[in-house]
Amino acid sequence: VKGTAVVYGGDDRYFNNIFVGGEPDEGWKCGTELYNGFTSSMEEYIEKTSVYLSDPDKVSGVRQPVYINNNSYLAGAKGFEKEKNKIESDYDPKIRVSKENGSFYLEIDIPEYGLVTDAQQVRTHNLPIPRITEAPYEKPDGTELVIDRDYFGNCRAGTPTAGPFEG
């Protein structure tokens, strides 16, 4: 261990996901709306913390940046207020898990209008570098990380749909 640091929340990344709500309880939230109030870039974080450099207690109150984009929110799930490309809908995808002949199947009804489809493929160059480690997201051998396959190994387009399944 070369050092330690306190992480006060944030420094998270959510790209190309599907969030599904449900029956809300008081105080319950689903989706990325829990990040409302967080900064959304390292530049914004530095700008907000620079005014408190003489008071570490106030610096710790500034939320670290989160990087959230190209997600779909269904059945009451809500997105981050600064997310630029998202779909929010009350559509219920009726998610089910069924079992046939010893195998399990995920069933989901996709809305006719689809899910976010003009997203970027997740790659090393579009995953912002973490604040504390300052190390890029890459493969163990140091080459570029490219998420170009879906859950089943099918090729993901240069503009993939939200969620684990392409097409």
List each model region and its residues.
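Glycine- and acidic/polar-rich repeat regions and solenoidal domains
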Residues: 1-120
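A short, sequence-level motif marking secondary-structure junctions
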Residues: 112, 123, 162-163
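Active-site and glycan-interaction determinants of carbohydrate-active enzymes
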Residues: 117-158
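Acidic side chains
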Residues: 69-71, 148-150, 161
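Short, surface-exposed, low-complexity cationic segments
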Residues: 159-167
